[in-house]
Amino acid sequence: NDERRFADGQQDYTGWMDFGRRDDEDDVNERDVRGFGSFLGKALKAALKIGANALGGSPQQREANDERRFADGQQDYTGWMDFGRRDDEDDVNERDVRGFGSFLGKALKAALKIGANALGGSLQQREVNDERRFADGQQDYTGWMDFGRRDGQQDYTGWMDFGRRDDEDDVHERDVRGFGSFLGKAL
Protein backbone atom coordinates (compact mmCIF):
# COMPACT_ATOMS: atom_id res chain seq x y z
CA ASN A 1 0.00 0.00 0.00
CA ASP A 2 3.00 2.28 -0.22
CA GLU A 3 1.75 3.94 -3.39
CA ARG A 4 -1.46 4.92 -1.60
CA ARG A 5 0.21 6.68 1.29
CA PHE A 6 0.85 10.36 1.63
CA ALA A 7 3.62 11.77 -0.52
CA ASP A 8 4.71 13.96 2.41
CA GLY A 9 6.12 11.00 4.32
CA GLN A 10 3.28 10.15 6.69
CA GLN A 11 3.66 6.40 6.93
CA ASP A 12 1.33 3.88 8.49
CA TYR A 13 3.32 0.83 9.42
CA THR A 14 0.53 -0.90 11.33
CA GLY A 15 -2.42 0.39 9.34
CA TRP A 16 -4.49 1.52 12.31
CA MET A 17 -3.66 5.21 12.17
CA ASP A 18 -3.60 5.75 8.43
CA PHE A 19 -6.37 8.29 8.15
CA GLY A 20 -6.53 10.79 5.33
CA ARG A 21 -5.08 8.88 2.38
CA ARG A 22 -5.78 10.60 -0.92
CA ASP A 23 -6.54 7.65 -3.18
CA ASP A 24 -9.07 8.99 -5.67
CA GLU A 25 -10.84 11.44 -3.40
CA ASP A 26 -10.74 15.19 -3.72
CA ASP A 27 -12.16 16.18 -0.34
CA VAL A 28 -9.20 15.47 1.91
CA ASN A 29 -10.83 17.09 4.92
CA GLU A 30 -13.85 14.81 4.72
CA ARG A 31 -11.55 11.84 4.35
CA ASP A 32 -9.54 12.95 7.37
CA VAL A 33 -12.63 13.33 9.50
CA ARG A 34 -14.05 9.96 8.52
CA GLY A 35 -10.69 8.28 8.94
CA PHE A 36 -10.11 9.83 12.34
CA GLY A 37 -13.61 8.88 13.43
CA SER A 38 -12.94 5.32 12.38
CA PHE A 39 -9.65 5.35 14.28
CA LEU A 40 -11.35 6.66 17.42
CA GLY A 41 -14.05 4.04 17.12
CA LYS A 42 -11.52 1.23 16.78
CA ALA A 43 -9.44 2.56 19.67
CA LEU A 44 -12.52 2.80 21.91
CA LYS A 45 -13.65 -0.67 20.91
CA ALA A 46 -10.20 -2.09 21.66
CA ALA A 47 -10.08 -0.33 25.03
CA LEU A 48 -13.54 -1.59 25.94
CA LYS A 49 -12.58 -5.12 24.92
CA ILE A 50 -9.39 -5.01 26.99
CA GLY A 51 -11.30 -3.60 29.96
CA ALA A 52 -14.03 -6.19 29.66
CA ASN A 53 -11.52 -9.03 29.52
CA ALA A 54 -9.54 -7.66 32.46
CA LEU A 55 -12.50 -6.85 34.70
CA GLY A 56 -15.10 -9.31 33.56
CA GLY A 57 -13.22 -12.51 32.99
CA SER A 58 -12.51 -14.34 29.76
CA PRO A 59 -15.07 -14.51 26.94
CA GLN A 60 -15.75 -18.12 27.92
CA GLN A 61 -16.57 -17.10 31.47
CA ARG A 62 -18.89 -14.38 30.24
CA GLU A 63 -20.62 -16.77 27.86
CA ALA A 64 -21.31 -19.11 30.77
CA ASN A 65 -23.08 -16.28 32.57
CA ASP A 66 -25.48 -15.37 29.78
CA GLU A 67 -28.44 -16.82 31.63
CA ARG A 68 -27.74 -14.57 34.61
CA ARG A 69 -27.78 -11.32 32.69
CA PHE A 70 -30.59 -8.83 32.58
CA ALA A 71 -33.13 -9.32 29.82
CA ASP A 72 -31.97 -6.13 28.15
CA GLY A 73 -28.38 -7.30 27.99
CA GLN A 74 -27.06 -4.39 30.04
CA GLN A 75 -25.81 -6.35 33.04
CA ASP A 76 -23.19 -9.00 33.61
CA TYR A 77 -22.85 -10.12 37.19
CA THR A 78 -19.27 -11.28 36.85
CA GLY A 79 -18.15 -8.74 34.27
CA TRP A 80 -19.37 -5.38 35.56
CA MET A 81 -17.74 -3.56 32.68
CA ASP A 82 -19.13 -5.79 29.94
CA PHE A 83 -21.52 -3.19 28.62
CA GLY A 84 -24.67 -4.63 27.17
CA ARG A 85 -23.44 -7.48 25.02
CA ARG A 86 -26.37 -8.99 23.17
CA ASP A 87 -25.16 -12.11 21.44
CA ASP A 88 -27.70 -11.95 18.62
CA GLU A 89 -27.19 -8.31 17.70
CA ASP A 90 -25.30 -7.10 14.70
CA ASP A 91 -24.95 -3.41 15.50
CA VAL A 92 -21.94 -3.56 17.78
CA ASN A 93 -21.25 0.15 17.70
CA GLU A 94 -24.76 1.10 18.77
CA ARG A 95 -24.68 -1.53 21.49
CA ASP A 96 -21.32 -0.34 22.80
CA VAL A 97 -22.46 3.27 22.88
CA ARG A 98 -25.72 2.49 24.64
CA GLY A 99 -24.03 0.17 27.12
CA PHE A 100 -21.24 2.64 27.82
CA GLY A 101 -23.76 5.43 28.29
CA SER A 102 -25.70 3.27 30.74
CA PHE A 103 -22.49 2.51 32.64
CA LEU A 104 -21.52 6.18 32.80
CA GLY A 105 -25.00 7.14 33.94
CA LYS A 106 -24.98 4.58 36.72
CA ALA A 107 -21.47 5.55 37.81
CA LEU A 108 -22.36 9.26 37.86
CA LYS A 109 -25.56 8.60 39.79
CA ALA A 110 -23.69 6.53 42.36
CA ALA A 111 -20.97 9.16 42.72
CA LEU A 112 -23.53 11.94 43.21
CA LYS A 113 -25.43 9.88 45.76
CA ILE A 114 -22.26 9.07 47.70
CA GLY A 115 -21.16 12.71 47.58
CA ALA A 116 -24.55 14.01 48.71
CA ASN A 117 -24.74 11.54 51.57
CA ALA A 118 -21.18 12.22 52.69
CA LEU A 119 -21.35 16.00 52.51
CA GLY A 120 -24.90 16.94 53.24
CA GLY A 121 -27.08 14.03 54.24
CA SER A 122 -29.67 12.35 52.09
CA LEU A 123 -32.17 14.21 49.95
CA GLN A 124 -34.94 13.35 52.38
CA GLN A 125 -32.99 14.83 55.28
CA ARG A 126 -32.38 18.03 53.39
CA GLU A 127 -36.02 18.30 52.35
CA VAL A 128 -37.08 18.11 56.00
CA ASN A 129 -34.91 21.12 56.75
CA ASP A 130 -36.36 23.37 54.06
CA GLU A 131 -38.48 25.22 56.61
CA ARG A 132 -35.39 25.92 58.70
CA ARG A 133 -33.51 27.78 56.01
CA PHE A 134 -33.14 31.50 55.61
CA ALA A 135 -36.15 33.38 54.28
CA ASP A 136 -33.87 35.46 52.08
CA GLY A 137 -33.36 32.62 49.63
CA GLN A 138 -30.02 31.22 50.74
CA GLN A 139 -30.40 27.61 49.78
CA ASP A 140 -28.30 24.64 50.70
CA TYR A 141 -28.41 22.31 47.73
CA THR A 142 -25.74 19.95 48.97
CA GLY A 143 -26.15 20.48 52.69
CA TRP A 144 -22.48 21.06 53.44
CA MET A 145 -22.46 24.84 53.01
CA ASP A 146 -25.62 25.73 54.92
CA PHE A 147 -24.18 28.27 57.33
CA GLY A 148 -26.31 30.89 59.02
CA ARG A 149 -29.40 28.94 60.06
CA ARG A 150 -30.99 30.70 63.04
CA ASP A 151 -32.73 27.90 64.90
CA GLY A 152 -29.77 26.30 66.59
CA GLN A 153 -29.98 23.14 64.54
CA GLN A 154 -26.72 21.46 63.73
CA ASP A 155 -25.54 21.14 60.17
CA TYR A 156 -25.19 17.52 59.02
CA THR A 157 -21.47 17.72 58.63
CA GLY A 158 -21.00 20.50 61.16
CA TRP A 159 -17.69 21.63 59.74
CA MET A 160 -18.92 24.71 57.93
CA ASP A 161 -21.90 25.76 60.07
CA PHE A 162 -20.41 28.93 61.50
CA GLY A 163 -22.18 32.11 62.46
CA ARG A 164 -25.57 30.88 63.62
CA ARG A 165 -27.51 33.55 65.52
CA ASP A 166 -29.47 31.40 67.95
CA ASP A 167 -29.94 33.46 71.12
CA GLU A 168 -26.73 35.44 71.09
CA ASP A 169 -26.54 39.17 70.55
CA ASP A 170 -22.91 39.43 69.51
CA VAL A 171 -23.13 38.02 66.02
CA HIS A 172 -19.55 38.94 65.19
CA GLU A 173 -18.24 37.04 68.19
CA ARG A 174 -20.36 34.08 67.17
CA ASP A 175 -19.02 34.27 63.64
CA VAL A 176 -15.43 34.39 64.86
CA ARG A 177 -15.88 31.47 67.23
CA GLY A 178 -17.78 29.49 64.63
CA PHE A 179 -15.11 30.12 62.02
CA GLY A 180 -12.41 29.12 64.50
CA SER A 181 -14.31 25.92 65.17
CA PHE A 182 -14.60 25.33 61.44
CA LEU A 183 -10.86 25.84 60.97
CA GLY A 184 -10.09 23.53 63.88
CA LYS A 185 -12.27 20.77 62.49
CA ALA A 186 -10.92 21.27 58.99
CA LEU A 187 -7.32 21.07 60.20
UniProtKB/Swiss-Prot annotation:
It holds the Pfam family Gastrin. GO terms for cellular component: axon; extracellular space. The keyword Secreted applies. GO terms for biological process: defense response; digestion. It comes from the Eukaryota. The modification Phenylalanine amide is found at residues 19, 83, 147, 162. GO terms for molecular function: neuropeptide hormone activity. Residues 1-21 are annotated as: Disordered. It is found in: Secreted. Expressed by the skin glands. The modification Sulfotyrosine is found at residues 13, 77, 141, 156. Keywords: Amidation, Amphibian defense peptide, Cleavage on pair of basic residues, Repeat, Secreted, Sulfation. Residues 1-9, 23-73, 87-137, 151-152, 166-187 form a propeptide. SMART domains: GASTRIN (SM00029). PANTHER family: CHOLECYSTOKININ. Belongs to the gastrin/cholecystokinin family. The pharmacological activities of caerulein are quite similar to the physiological activities of gastrin and related peptides. This is Preprocaerulein clone PXC202. It comes from Xenopus laevis (African clawed frog). The lineage of its organism: Eukaryota, Metazoa, Chordata, Craniata, Vertebrata.
